[in-house]
């Protein structure tokens, strides 16, 4: 069979179809995380807040050097359990928050939150820091800011084995309207909670 440039053989088309059907969960939540990072860059560039993503502490165990200039990490482990995703300062207040995303339409799985994260959030609150979670429902295209005290209260009911209903989040949290700049304008809600005007 002769394949002219404008034709694709069936075999290649089938291989491409098989690859495109594969679901990749490795970067789940990355779009939401990217939007938060862009928002934080926006706040930083305008001198509104200094908030950064915390690096995850990793211990590199084995590195492969196929070429001198192309080192490849082959084996690595988390050094310790991470706390929350983001921290920083806004108007002299310490801010600490976690970001979670789900495709579910009616609840946020509590298995996404770990005991050490809940403990850390509790410690931040005890030091009068501002602590919360940003919860994104990707299917619904809805984002909420839920104060950490409300997350902790729900978590303590059953140590995080259930899912948090969207109704609970709507009653105790704050809807964040999508915008172009910043993409996830959560500081507007923080400002209102502090008693200021936006």
Swiss-Prot record:
Stated role: Endonuclease that resolves Holliday junction intermediates in genetic recombination. Cleaves mobile four-strand junctions by introducing symmetrical nicks in paired strands. Promotes annealing of linear ssDNA with homologous dsDNA. Required for DNA repair, homologous recombination and chromosome segregation.
Entry keywords, A to Z: Cytoplasm, DNA damage, DNA recombination, DNA repair, Endonuclease, Hydrolase, Magnesium, Metal-binding, Nuclease
Site (Transition state stabilizer): 100
Catalytic reaction equation(s): Endonucleolytic cleavage at a junction such as a reciprocal single-stranded crossover between two homologous DNA duplexes (Holliday junction)
Catalytic EC class: hydrolase
GO BP field: chromosome segregation; DNA recombination; DNA repair
Gene behind the chain: recU
Superkingdom to which the source organism belongs: Bacteria
Molecular-function GO terms, alphabetical: endonuclease activity; magnesium ion binding; nucleic acid binding
Cofactor: how and how many bound: Binds 1 Mg(2+) ion per subunit.
UniProt family annotation: Belongs to the RecU family.
An annotated GO cellular component: cytoplasm
HAMAP family xrefs: RecU (MF_00130)
InterPro entries from the UniProt entry: Resolv_RecU (IPR004612), Restrct_endonuc-II-like (IPR011335), tRNA_endonuc-like_dom_sf (IPR011856)
UniProt-annotated location(s): Cytoplasm
Cofactor(s) the protein requires to work: Mg(2+)
Binding site for Mg(2+): 83, 85, 98, 117
Disulfide bond positions: none
The enzyme's E.C. designation: 3.1.21.10
The organism of origin for this protein: Streptococcus thermophilus (strain ATCC BAA-250 / LMG 18311)
Protein name: Holliday junction resolvase RecU
């Amino acid at each position: 069979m002769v394949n002219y440039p404008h034709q694709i053989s069936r075999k290649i088309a089938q291989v491409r179809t098989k690859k495109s059907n594969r679901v990749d969960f490795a970067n789940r939540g990355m779009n939401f995380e990217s939007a938060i990072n862009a928002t934080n860059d926006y706040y930083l560039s305008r001198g509104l807040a200094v908030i950064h993503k915390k690096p995850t502490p990793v211990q590199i165990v084995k590195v492969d050097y196929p070429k001198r200039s192309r080192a490849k990490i082959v084996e690595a482990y988390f050094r310790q359990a991470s706390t929350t995703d983001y921290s920083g300062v806004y108007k002299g207040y310490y801010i600490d928050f976690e970001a979670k995303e789900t495709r579910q339409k009616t609840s946020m799985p509590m298995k996404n939150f770990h005991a050490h994260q809940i403990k850390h959030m509790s410690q931040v609150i005890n030091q009068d820091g501002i602590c919360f979670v940003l919860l994104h429902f990707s299917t619904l295209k809805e984002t909420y800011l839920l104060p950490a005290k409300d997350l902790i209260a729900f978590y303590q009911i059953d140590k995080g084995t259930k899912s948090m209903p969207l109704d609970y989040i709507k009653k105790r949290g704050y809807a964040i309207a999508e915008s172009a700049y910043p993409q996830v304008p959560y500081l507007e809600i923080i400002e209102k909670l502090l008693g200021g005007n936006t």
